[in-house]
Amino acid sequence: MPRVEKIIPVWGTEIYIDASSSKIDATEIDRVIAGVEAFLFDVDEELSTFKENSSVSKLRANKLKIEDAPDMVQEVWRGCAKAKELSFGSFDPWAVEGGFDPSGFVKGWAAEKAAVMLVSAGCDQVQVNAAGDIALRGKEPWKIGVVNPDNKSEIVQVFEITNGNIATSGHYEKGAHIKDPHTGVIAIGAKSGTVIGPDGGICDALATALMVDGQDAAQWIGNPELSEYTFWSINRHENSAWSHGPNLGLAK
């Protein structure tokens, strides 16, 4: 079965794509990945907080109203609002300095969009890894490991995911810079937070919320709207972890 792997440098990081297909050949997979690459650069142009002419920068500068923004931007705005609601405000892209910053949602959201593009074009087995926010599709499960935030050479948990998304937030992923939107100071809830579920953007955002709340996330993870999501978190001050949800991972 033809398989193509590619690394795309964008958003100041690298996006890894692994796509296989029993329906189309490697040349066609390459063509589809080129379309995905164009989409990822469009995301950067519209949603970057670093590009002065992006729609997000214009929103932050009050030079654009959300109702006048491109559909992509409005979709992300709505997704961020939903994640804020689900997390009781522990994910809040409006609480950051300078105004609306969807960075904690966009990687997971875009990875899922890219995976859908690849599957729609005929790929059977797909992984899109946007710097730790991963979208997975396939007939066979993918094994995804979570790294120990205190020892990057150690895998502390493994999840099998066939069709879904996984996002991890921790000190190895700029965790020291995650602020608690309720207090404005550095988040001290958890050492690492992982979320698995059907929506990549929501996984990305709620992994950040886990870092903020730690075990206090118990107040919102039981929401019936999150019944398809799995949460796995390493406690900050104890050598222990806890989990909630349908995919409890593989014992290490």
Model-predicted segments: where are they?
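Mature catalytic core of soluble alpha/beta enzymes
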Residues: 1-252
